[in-house]
Amino acid sequence: MRQFLTALIIFALGLPTFAETRKVHRSDGARGICLGCEDRGDKSVDQIRALRSAVGGDQSYKDIYKYNYNKQKDRKVAEVCSSMVTNTGYGPWGRHILNILNEREYPNLFDGTPDLVSLCPAYPQLGPEEKKVVFVAIMNVMVLGESTCGAGPHTAKGPNGTAVGILQLHRGKEASYESEGRHGHGPEIGCKNGDGEKPESSLKCGLHLLDMQFAAKGELLSRSSHWEVLRPQGRKQKHKWTKKIVSELSICK
């Protein structure tokens, strides 16, 4: 209903239904989408955002909660993942993600990737606060897939050591993830040994690793990702969880 009302208002005001994404020329002469750019001369994007907020505000937490609620017939996922989102708003983990995400520390997340845009066509036009919501959704399925939102075993033995916490980071080896390079990050940003033990530090480290993945691979869904829900070749095909939750976000349409 909210989307219908937004479309109706846009039509009445004579605004374009879809904002034109600015095109850029690469050095090889090909044309592409500037994922992190906005055309400041085109006010229609800001007008559409304002209309969306006026109609109903940010209801994205409801989209994430709906995904969790419908994940299993017994509705247990919505209950165990309440630290991320509830039917009334963001839980402490969701709020933590919204609070720590910023364009300086995680520039590649805010720029996005082509496969993220394919799942969320509106991503290039979203404002910073809306982009943060997309990563609450992504982190939601990541902690669901790795630890059932903390309800599963705290540790697990693996070939590379003991995985620990809600994102199953390698205990005592979290800082070694830096070996792939900081990609311009400052010295205070990244993962530290022990981050996997607590949810808040796990989430920050996880976002940092995802930012590094975006920079190195240019993909949300990557065969070399640390997490199964982001690996398209995974035996259980959990990457489909990520595709589903992102594509069903109202702000992405």
Question: Which stretches of residues belong to each language-model region?
Answer:
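Sec/Tat signal peptide C-region and signal peptidase I cleavage site
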Residues: L15-A19
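Catalytic glycan-binding domains that act on GlcNAc-containing polysaccharides
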Residues: D42, R49-K253
